[in-house]
A protein has these predicted regions:
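Long, low-complexity, mixed-charge
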Residues: 1-221
Length: 221
């Protein structure tokens, strides 16, 4: 996949703290200002110049912007987790380290668990992140499984059940009320009907581990 989206990274210098903006590739998305400001505030840098940030994002060029005084603490690689409203997906985005350490699989699983993600974790998608370490990019690290609806029980009849009460019409236009075709002729041993039991379907689950039941079906005795 590679790094297509624009992203940002802290740069800690002797005299001040900067945020470095990396431009998007041709097919990539620019930085979302809300995502950037939330990241800065989360790391104790609320005194940024919003207009300067917006102008830098719109230029889509590599640049550094001062966002605060010296910030001596190292920043580790981190991940945000957003669980969809229906809890069927957990979308994660990663942010690069600044002098700190990168995340490993155990830390990713820990952060997913901390956000209530207990089921449907996609190990292959986690490995995909490690291959490219694409930042400010959506990775669907967990998916729920939709239930499979079943079918009602049914009876299949092996004789004519479509009773037609219309009298037989003769060639001369008259009708014969004695021929109503309401009787099916059978012999001993003929299979008259077969009961097909209900199919209850297959249960699903969301990423929070909650069971999702299929639609209720009708049974027959």
């Amino acid at each position: 996949m590679g790094q297509a989206n624009a992203y940002f990274q802290f740069v800690i210098k002797e005299h001040a703290t900067y945020i470095k903006l990396f431009p998007a590739a041709l097919e990539g998305n620019v930085i979302e200002i809300g995502e950037l400001t939330e990241y800065l505030e989360r790391h104790g840098c609320p005194d940024y110049n919003l207009k300067e940030l917006v102008a830098a994002i719109n230029s889509n060029e590599m640049t550094e912007i001062m966002v605060g005084d010296i910030y001596p603490i190292q920043i580790n690689e981190e991940m945000s987790v957003t669980v969809s409203a229906d809890a069927m997906e957990a979308v994660c985005r990663f942010y690069p380290a600044a002098g700190g350490t990168n995340m490993n699989v155990q830390e990713i699983l820990r952060d997913l668990t901390a956000k209530g993600v207990k089921a449907g974790v996609d190990q292959d998608e986690i490995l995909k992140f490690f291959q490219d370490r694409a930042y400010c990019t959506d990775f669907v690290l967990a998916k729920g499984k939709k239930p499979v609806d079943g079918q009602d029980a049914r009876i299949e009849y092996y004789f004519n059940t479509d009773v037609d009460l219309k009298p037989k019409k003769n060639e001369d236009g008259s009708v014969d009320y004695r021929e109503l075709n309401v009787i099916s002729y059978i012999k001993e041993g003929d299979l008259l009907a077969k009961l097909f039991p209900e199919d209850r379907g297959i249960k699903g689950y969301d990423v929070q581990g909650r069971e999702i039941k299929p639609k209720q079906v009708r049974s027959l005795q």
